[in-house]
Structures are given as structure tokens and as C-alpha cells.
Amino acid sequence: MYEQIYNLTRMFFKSLKGNLMYEFLISKFNGKRDPQRKLSLEQIVALNIYRFHFKTGDLKNYHKMIKELMSDKVPNLPNYENFMKATNKSTVFILAFMNFLMEMNRTILKTSFSVMQILLTVR
């Protein structure tokens, strides 16, 4: 299941490449220095979406669970503090990805925001 979510996030971020708002938000996500993270943005978003599968609200316990159960799928998992910082910085992208999933799978429910409108609103 994690692989499916990760593949969807990769497809989502590929579709945003070249967009000026996306480039601006990526520069804010990376900070003034080059990115020091061990996980890519796609992995961070995928792991945070996958958290809903386990129904854990506590990020610390989820981090321990990933470290023990998914060490083969996520071998370069950072320590808890860096994982928490990356999760907090990626909230905008998680919301945009969730909107992307709703748009892909909508039948009756129609959202009024495009992905870029959500990125602008949250930022």
C-alpha cells in the first residue's frame, strides 16, 4: 500500500514541475541552505498519508512504527525531530495532494479549489 501511495505522490509532484508557485513553495520548503533531509518530499508526503492507514494520531509512535516495520522500504528515515520538522513543513503539500486525490476520484463531490488555489490559500 505504501508503494502505491508513493507512486501517486511522485506522479503528483511530477505534474507540478515547472509551475512558478510550486517552485516558490519548494524553495521555502528547502530553506536558505540546500536540503539537508534524508527523505524526499514525495516520501514525506507518502508517509504522512500512510499514517491514516494505521490510525495513529501520535507522530512519535508512528515514527517508531515506521522505524521497526518499514526499515526495508524507508531505510534512510531520519530521527524523530527531523521527521517532525519535515512533516510540519510539508503540510501545504499534503493538503494539495489530498485535493489532487479527491479530484482524481470524484464522482459526486466537487471541490471548488484547484491544487494551486490550495497552495496559495494555505501559504
Q: Residue locations for each model-derived region?
A:
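Short alpha-helical elements
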Residues: M1-R123
